[in-house]
């Protein structure tokens, strides 16, 4: 139906933009702020699921700034975005602080239809990706299911009146 068509069009638009998203200031800054909030929580997050939006920036900054991450699952609807992440972090990514190897898994899926098992990640991060989703409560419920008990879901999302001036222009 219409929802599937719109979802497909959004995916195509993301794939067109993914090649230029590496230097996007807004994505970099939003990611920095989300990870700054993550730093306020003094517990380890070894397995992190990154869904949609600033996937490239988030994975890159996790490798640069987190001392505890061991596994990152990069989930995006755009194959081009996932390939860009792989190009940037390489085949054998390591944490910047200690050179510890980090396993990265790549999953191509829509945010509201995650093919991730229940109770497998400590943290779910989504930076500016959930505003694309047709079923936001469903997507958040799917993300919650992937979390271990006492896991953390942390997201930055555009609100209804965000960037009004740009939409009008």
Regions found by a protein language model. Name each.
Residues 137-152:
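A short glycine-rich, Lys/Arg-flanked "PGG" loop and its adjoining helix->strand segment in the class I
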Residues 36-123, 137-141:
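Class I SAM-dependent methyltransferase SAM/SAH-binding core
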Residues 135-136, 159:
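Conserved catalytic-core motifs of eukaryotic protein kinase domains, centered on the activation segment
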Residues 58, 134, 163:
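Glycine/Thr-rich phosphate-binding loops of Rossmann-like dinucleotide-binding domains
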Residues 128-131:
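Short catalytic micro-motifs in class I SAM-dependent methyltransferases
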Residues 1-46:
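Class I SAM-dependent methyltransferase Rossmann-like catalytic core
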């Amino acid at each position: 139906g219409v929802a599937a068509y719109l979802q497909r069009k959004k995916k195509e638009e993301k794939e067109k933009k993914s090649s230029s998203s590496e230097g996007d200031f807004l994505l970099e800054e939003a990611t920095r702020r989300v990870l700054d909030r993550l730093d306020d929580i003094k517990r380890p997050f070894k397995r992190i699921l990154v869904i949609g939006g600033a996937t490239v920036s988030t994975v890159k900054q996790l490798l640069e700034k987190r001392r505890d991450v061991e596994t990152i699952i990069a989930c995006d609807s755009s194959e081009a975005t996932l390939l860009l992440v792989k190009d940037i972090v390489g085949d054998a990514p390591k944490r910047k602080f200690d050179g510890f190897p980090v396993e990265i898994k790549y999953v191509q899926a829509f945010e509201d239809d995650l093919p991730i098992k229940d109770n497998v990640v400590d943290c779910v991060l989504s930076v500016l990706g959930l505003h694309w989703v047709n079923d936001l409560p469903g997507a958040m419920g799917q993300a919650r299911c992937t979390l271990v008990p006492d896991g953390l879901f942390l997201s930055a999302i555009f609100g209804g009146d965000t960037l009004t001036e740009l939409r009008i222009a």
